[in-house]
């Protein structure tokens, strides 16, 4: 029975990552060079930046829901089977740790992308300030 339970859990764990195809990480927009960009280019880029950041948040919501669904889809186990319980708990922890890493990476990219955008905005504003008589 223990081997059957482990086999079922293993087969579900192999199948579950296929569900991950529904959440696509958004493509990062290209930022204009603030030292040469027009006002229109900067305004368009600002819209793209906001859309990208919102899309990353949607991606994070999506992968979080996928993980909840994947954990809920794990097969029922005999709670008296300590090996099965331990195996299931280890799998849930592994998935939680992986989700946390994905969240951290996405939030780090949001931060760094925001910093790059702010650098271009500063370059644009500095150029405009220099052009004033």
Describe the predicted segments one by one.
Residues 9-12, 63-65:
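A ubiquitous, low-specificity "background" feature that marks scattered single residues
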Residues 11-20:
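Hydrophobic h-region of N-terminal signal peptides that target proteins for export
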Residues 1-11:
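Bacterial N-terminal signal peptides that target proteins for export
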Residues 74-133:
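Compact alpha-helical subdomains of small soluble proteins
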Residues 6, 27, 60, 81-84, ...:
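Low-complexity, compositionally biased segments
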Residues 19-68:
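Immediate post-signal-peptide N-terminus of mature secreted/exported proteins
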């Amino acid at each position: 029975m223990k081997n059957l339970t482990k086999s079922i859990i293993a087969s579900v764990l192999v199948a579950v990552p296929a569900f991950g195809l529904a959440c696509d990480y958004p493509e990062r927009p290209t930022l204009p060079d603030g030292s040469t960009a027009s006002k229109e280019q900067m305004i368009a880029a600002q819209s793209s930046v906001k859309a990208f950041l919102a899309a990353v948040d949607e991606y994070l919501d999506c992968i979080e829901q996928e993980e909840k669904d994947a954990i809920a889809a794990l097969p029922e186990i005999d709670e008296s089977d300590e090996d099965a319980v331990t195996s299931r708990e280890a799998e849930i922890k592994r998935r939680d740790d992986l989700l946390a890493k994905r969240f951290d990476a996405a939030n780090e990219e949001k931060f760094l992308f925001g910093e790059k955008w702010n650098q271009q905005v500063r370059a644009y504003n500095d150029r405009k300030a220099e052009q004033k008589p």
